A protein has these predicted regions:
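Hydrophobic alpha-helical interaction segments
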Residues: 16, 24, 116-203
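Short gly/ser-rich loop at a beta-strand->alpha-helix junction or flexible surface loop bordering the NTP-binding
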Residues: 2-133
Length: 203
């Protein structure tokens, strides 16, 4: 059954940043067994494991913005547009909070070392949580990847995306991407990746 939008506001309860009385009330409900704690400060008003997965997948941005403030959806996840349909890992770049995983019902966040939000990255509403810009995505996905499901989508995926951009927006857009990527590469330490990207665009 589809949950009405009004009801969904209460399916995830977060104590971080909440007024003290609200946070204490949530903690009391959890202690009484009314709520399920899925991460520090994050609770669900649901016990069924499959329903928990569905709730987390509906609210993953809000949840991860609390657990990893300042993170950027990056690499393969940015290339794919966010959370994959098969429930795979989502890669988040963060300058200080990295080399760890956060396992939630239905979602695994993989934190990798990388810059926080940069010029061109998109912020999700009022959340301290971001989505990598297209030039940043292309650079990151040319970085070394380990295994078929590593953090980077790889050169073939980048080539395919460049062809799509060319067909949709023309050469000027590719040149704009190259100019922006050139500057980003300097601050991100991805000069070799930019050389690859430059060669692809120039080919």
């Amino acid at each position: 059954m589809k949950i009405p939008a009004a009801s969904r506001q209460d399916e995830v309860l977060i104590t971080r940043g909440a007024p003290d009385n609200e946070a204490r009330a949530i903690q009391r409900r959890a202690k009484a067994g009314e709520l399920t704690r899925i991460a520090e400060g994050v609770y669900l008003a649901e016990r069924d494991p499959e329903t928990q997965k569905a709730i987390v997948r509906r609210n993953w941005i809000r949840i991860l913005a609390v657990l990893v403030p300042g993170a950027v959806i990056s690499h393969r996840s940015a290339y794919q547009g966010g959370l994959s349909a098969d429930g795979g890992s989502i890669y988040l770049s963060h300058p200080t909070n990295y080399n760890r995983k956060i396992d939630l019902p239905g979602v695994r966040a993989v934190l990798v070392k990388g810059p926080g939000p940069m010029a061109g990255d998109t912020r999700f509403g009022n959340e301290n949580f971001y989505f990598a810009s297209r030039p940043r995505q292309l650079l990151e996905n040319l970085s070394a990847a380990r295994g078929p499901r590593g953090k980077s989508a790889g050169a073939k995926a980048v080539e395919d995306r460049l062809v799509s951009i060319l067909n949709a927006s023309g050469e000027n857009e590719l040149n704009n991407i190259r100019d922006t990527a050139r500057e980003l590469a300097k601050s991100m330490g991805l000069r070799q990746e930019f050389k690859k990207l430059d060669g692809m665009i120039g080919a």
